[in-house]
């Protein structure tokens, strides 16, 4: 089954089965973990999701760890890819953020995941995804999810996400003072033809031959693209 989905999520921790670099994860299902909000997305650089109105919030991804003998796994992830739709089921590999992002982007994404409390409302969940998209796709000097217009800008207007947009900007404003905790890092669930996701691991992800580690997963999962009479998903 193919879902046009924009993965969106806010930080939420779980204890998940072991994963490692080069681990293959097969995702078979997803849902919003704490609800969602919607808004009109703008990307000055264009792309398939420019001027679309998805719902966004933290996603709960479930599936199996293929490398570990199809052990059941659960991740909470955020979308970091607005160029691909999410296909479920779909296979992903665990990769470093450097595969897609600059050192500054990777650091800020990790700070965001490590310092924002687990969401308990739809606004908190949506705010986390918006802040993640701002880091990933806004290349302007000012990070503000509510304004834009220069090349590389990302911003959001209208919809039910007004509170989430304000909250997202408060997260972004704290990036200069937040730090990355020792022993934790963010990683990608990556597929070049599928929609890549980001999650946070409380301890370093070991090499492929090392098992038995528990991680804390964070994430965004696909958002429901909504038009008034037609719904379709991005993720």
In which residue ranges do the predicted regions lie?
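Short, threonine-centered small-residue motifs that mark membrane-proximal processing/anchoring sites
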Residues: 2-8, 12-24, 196-225
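Sequence-pattern detector for short linear motifs
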Residues: 5, 168, 229-231
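Enrichment for repetitive, rod-forming helical segments
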Residues: 9, 136, 233-235
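Short, surface-exposed polybasic-aromatic patches that bind anionic ligands, especially phosphate groups
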Residues: 23-202
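C-terminal membrane-anchoring or membrane-association module
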Residues: 222-235
């Amino acid at each position: 089954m193919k879902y046009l989905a924009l993965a969106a999520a806010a930080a939420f921790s779980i204890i998940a089965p072991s994963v490692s670099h080069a681990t293959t994860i097969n995702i078979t299902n997803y849902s919003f973990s704490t609800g969602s909000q919607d808004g009109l997305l703008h990307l000055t650089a264009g792309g398939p999701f420019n001027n679309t109105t998805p719902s966004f919030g933290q996603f709960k991804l479930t599936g199996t760890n293929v490398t570990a003998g199809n052990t059941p796994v659960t991740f909470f992830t955020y979308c970091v890819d607005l160029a691909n739709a999410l296909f479920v089921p779909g296979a992903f590999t665990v990769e470093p953020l450097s595969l897609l992002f600059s050192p500054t982007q990777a650091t800020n994404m990790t700070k965001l995941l490590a310092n924002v409390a687990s969401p308990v409302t739809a606004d908190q969940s949506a705010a986390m995804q918006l802040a993640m998209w701002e880091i990933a796709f806004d290349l302007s000097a000012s990070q503000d999810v509510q304004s834009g217009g220069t090349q590389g800008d990302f911003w959001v207007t209208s919809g039910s996400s007004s509170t989430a947009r304000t909250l997202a900007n408060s997260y972004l404003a704290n990036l200069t003072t937040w730090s990355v905790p020792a022993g934790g890092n963010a990683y990608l669930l990556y597929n070049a033809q599928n929609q890549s996701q980001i999650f946070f691991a409380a301890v370093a992800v070991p090499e492929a031959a090392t098992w038995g580690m528990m991680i804390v997963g964070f994430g965004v999962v696909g958002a429901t693209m909504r038009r008034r009479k037609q719904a379709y998903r991005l993720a």
